[in-house]
């Protein structure tokens, strides 16, 4: 397995249109991101997956995205919970397994266990704060180690998983699944065992699902419960990524060396100052190509081989091009990614959609083989985007963009790559060279075609960055980049223009009827076969999206079903028509890759399924709303299909350039503006159409706080072979000019060329480049049309007012001084806003066609200025003017200025079309300036010293006519090559020499324009952000439309302003075809600000609306007000209700609608027909009281009153005199009549303000609340049922105490004694009731059989149970806020308002009486003393606080100033404590209403840490009519564990209930067995028909009354589950508490006895194991005589009680594997029969202070060992038995085999606790060479006894006394069983003699023979000699 390293980039901009450059989706695109299935351990050898095909391998590459929310880009709190439950089939002998779990750099480990099937059951918490996308890229790693091994190979196996996989699962959780472990380094090894785990991802506000832990019901079949089923077992694959070449890499190195070469006359090559190499990273592996030095177009021709398990846990193959640096770190050039989910398909993602949600599985099965494919890509170029290309020696502020963090702002080259996938894992090199044949094959994919691009700029508006002149540059790739000298010059930039004021707020560029045009040609591969399909699918998606929006709006507007059905039918019909339309074929197309064919097949199949599903839905669907989910799924699918990973054409990038610096940019995907000859549908969405583009700043830290500019631009892109098609798209007349400027200076009173200093006689617009008329040569294909002419530039001042009816001129008056001196006129007394010299006010005359609206120039004091209008600044050299201005004068200030303004308006007597005749002076065309470089003006002044005029020469195409001729303008205008050296030198200085001066000027002139009239109807806003300290804002809105803007009035102190204002833009000239404007009109942009008296107004948010265009005034369609979101920094900050209509205006304005009525001068209201239709409505307000009010300005709130505002009406309550004593209002009901819209969509919110009445008349607002949705408070006053009436809802306070309910204290003791006695007899307790209620019947004993009733266990808070309506049926609780909203936080909560509302319509006819009031006869507002009982049952999954991953929890109760800290009863070392505690205390309501239950972690030495807390509103429980103060049990018992505990009996509660419902009291009959209530008859028999009657039940009438009460929807006896929260992670669960609360008012007497919920204690048991014999044990040793033998003994223990290990004596010298023991093991243990778990309490370490309690399943482990005296004993084998699922043993050893223990073959098992004892043979096994072998058989008797039985039938360990039950005799071992070391005689007898008997006999005979022979030969010579001497003897 490949280790994983999270990618450094986890965030990118969702608007990145580069296709393949997207690192990771964000925002809306995140739902389009597919997430691969992550594994790190599946092996091809897993059973159940033979012969896998490619599509089976890829089947789960792509996860479903439907479960993934739209993820934000903001860091959030998350919690990952991992529970390690148990292991199974772990390899190894006598191992000690431990699991380490790593998530996001945090690692936790389990406790060390023993055996091959360990049970862990430990949970780990990982708290992280990161963006969702970063989190989903993190991985979860399980590593299983053998802790007993100190070798390096102690890792047994591992499994890796992506957090994103868990997040995509239902509930963001993987519940109790087995994961397969494998060896990460050995791809050929098999499974290394299994782990059962649960995994949860808990986000903000998420509730983790409840994990069921029923061991009996759990599926233990590993294969069927694998996390990834065996059918999709993963295989090793190899990714071959071929990297051929790159091009257009920008300069990355300093040009110092090149500059030195240049000085000495050598050739320089600055374009190749880069040393590129490519780094490929995937799944933690990084591989780099070779480095190629000094080459901007390198050719690597290398292949990278990546071996991985597939499908992989990693989504992106990341390619980063680096520039190698010798001394410093390598610089990133750019980063791009191959997203596996986009270049592969599983096949399983194709489903047949239908309205019932049941797809056709047969169809799905047949198509998976057709459409599934492994990752493949290219050969194709991948584009790189990042920071601007211009090289500087300074650190790049946008360097992060080059790593893929954020949207790249500039093209930085591209890389040609190809990816193929092979299903093998043969070991090969990581990187190798590509063969020459492959290089030749890829050549055909690089064929270039010429593309032409033309962009016409219609307007540039909403500019706020003013100052220097502005131009725009359009580039595609490197083509058109004015600062890049590697490409030939193109007319890719507009002329410089200065922004001018629009008279209201913004600035714009005054292009008027002459629109700048840029044109460029470029060369790219022809990928039209891909982009045509993309455009067709996008058009289809847009239509479906639009239809879905229309349908949703119709549903929201509650249109009739017939109308809804029409809209729905139109949507379905359009979709069917779209999907039936054939797609362009790939046949005969060039550059078609494998991926093209596969994606084409995928698209065709998907469209077919969507079409079939739509046809089926059309015929079968009945509910329109129910089909929306499925239709939106189709939309998601279409959006995925429209993505094109092989989009090699770079984006069109528009740059805004100011003072030769890049300021802001926009990226337009090329396919959106691309012309296609296939069909009109295949053309780009905006091809040849005017679109609105909002520019943005690179890496904008303010996140869109300010828009640099809003552009209206028309872009056309197409192949040069179809460039004539451009003629049909073009509007206006294109003009092409060469341009130069004639410069003169004033010297000695004469104008001439002397005195020009560095300026030339003829130059470009900047004056820095010398030009000559003769040096201009027209481009190829063009010729001069006429001679050079003077073309005077009209002053910008006269163009600033184009289209305006009124205008404000501004001039700044300047004064200067030395610090501390007197103010005197500055050298430049009058300037413009930029500090450039301007004429004095007396010299400025009113332009032609205008008249002054003011008497004279006025000082503007409505700014940050002093009372005379001055603002002050300090000039710091070398600057010549201050950079900032302030309103207060200081001694050190050197400059001051004030703004003079004068309004003028159109002269109605002058026609708009007539123009003033040019004076002779103007015809000369001179522009004047005081100094070179200053702003020019037309009228000469005495201070002027410099003048210039523009000469232009028009060009015409020589061989081509029409607008398309502009595409021939390639290259710069030719220049005279015989220029002097100065000219040559200047040409080398900057790239600007090539651009601007020498490129032709293209413009588009519109002879005809259309005058429009815009009306913007701004009605109201809601939910705006508070930006003032008084918790409100003072909002106003700037509304911008093209070059006009207007501002609404300011509404003070509100977050929900109602402007009700119509902004009228009387005449707006728009150039272009009206039908094109109607199709894509300019946007209306509304920017909302908070007005501040001091300081700059703060930005609240922005909204964009598209106006409704009316070209035919006869069609009277009124625009509809709609809510538009207000956005600020990608955050939703409210909504704006507005509409806009754009009407084409006739000259006299006769076709315009009449003006709306005025509310004030020049403030028009929204007219009837557009404004909402209103109705007189009554709002009744129940103002019950205020709670938990926090101090304001260091003083507590003591005398508050409440103000309610709605629809312009205001009512106020009386003042509460003393909030601490009486927090309720004296008079609780307010009434107001309001005109509210009938349509709920337009209803304004209700605003609640709390005002504190303080000394000296101060009345600060100390809290406010906005209630936006009023629909839930609407009611029909005539149909209100009596039981729902608010005044009848409070039962407890109005019922009088009755004496017979008082429980006498003296009766309680014998009752308790009887109860305890019964408990002993019945062996049931409250926990029996609890477990019976949760369904854990095995834990409740005889409880259910006895006929006892259960309670209700809610898995949530009681307030969240839907039928109890949040317990707010009497009154709701509204949080009060105060203060300014900071960037990250919401306004702080400062209190609560308890109250409610009733809203109903009033009759329009005043003669009709008003409906009856809703809030009447309310209960008293005085305090009530109550007894509160808090029952804490248990904690669930608490957040660990100790280093060991556990917690020592205890309970802390806080009620106002009363605190109960139960520190003494902490529960050590657990995350799931069983508290079983009850607390009782008294309180006064409503003053002490908030009951806070906290869980703390006990620490001995340090401060206790809070785990979490939950707060209960006791007042709501007390006042609710649902009886939540004390839940109703199912039966009425007067004794036993279910004894009645309420103060009132059921009959009394029923009587009160009847009185509250205004119905007759209940009537009993038949001795209380029959009851009549609410006109219904009830009998006791019908309720107790199937119930078992027991002795604890009360009298019949009480039982029957209780049964009737339980039918009335009251709260039953219950246990609720409350989530704990902490301030550390405010919205993430820190665990849960199961608990409930009872509240009893003391006025009704003492309550019944409390429940005893003390936890159960474990019972003592004894396991007796008698080891009789062993057989067929492995013979592990050889004796000295060579015999195979073993000295056998048996060792055993219960897991958790390892310190009580026991072993038999040794059966020495077993020669046949047989051992005889007759040995008894006695294992005492504590056991909970109800939970079937053993309780083990022990200290984890010797330094631990507390014992840790573990709950483990009861198991027995027995091991067979070989005894060695002089070395370590040898391990032979083991058997592990689960005492609950004990394998039934074999009766005879011959039938004892592996099959007994084979879980997969479902061997027979039984519970030893039920059978009590078992006897027979069990097999033992061991592991050898990775396989299990039979290590022997063991005969045993197993017996489980409880403590009582063990005392009655005693038995000793081994054969010790008392040796009974049964008596064990010494084993009848053979005589050969002994220890040779201690028995030498037996050794001689049984080892030596038995083995070597014949050897000994032979040796003796041989010895005798040898002795005989020795004697013979010894005596033979003497005998012979004697015979010779004495022969006769």
Curated annotation (Swiss-Prot):
Ranges of Acidic residues composition bias in the record: 27-36
Biased segments, Basic residues type: 898-907
Highest rank taxon of the organism: Eukaryota
Binding site for Ca(2+) 5: 1764, 1767, 1770
Ranges for region Disordered: 1-53, 898-918, 1845-1867
UniProt keyword list: Calcium, Cell membrane, Cytoplasmic vesicle, Membrane, Metal-binding, Nucleus, Repeat, Signal-anchor, Transmembrane, Transmembrane helix
Binding annotation for Ca(2+) 4: 1442, 1448, 1497, 1499
InterPro entries: C2_dom, C2_domain_sf, C2B_Ferlin, C2C_Ferlin, C2D_Ferlin, C2E_Ferlin, C2F_Ferlin, FerIin_dom
Function: May play a role in membrane regeneration and repair.
Name assigned to this protein: Myoferlin
Organism: Xenopus tropicalis (Western clawed frog)
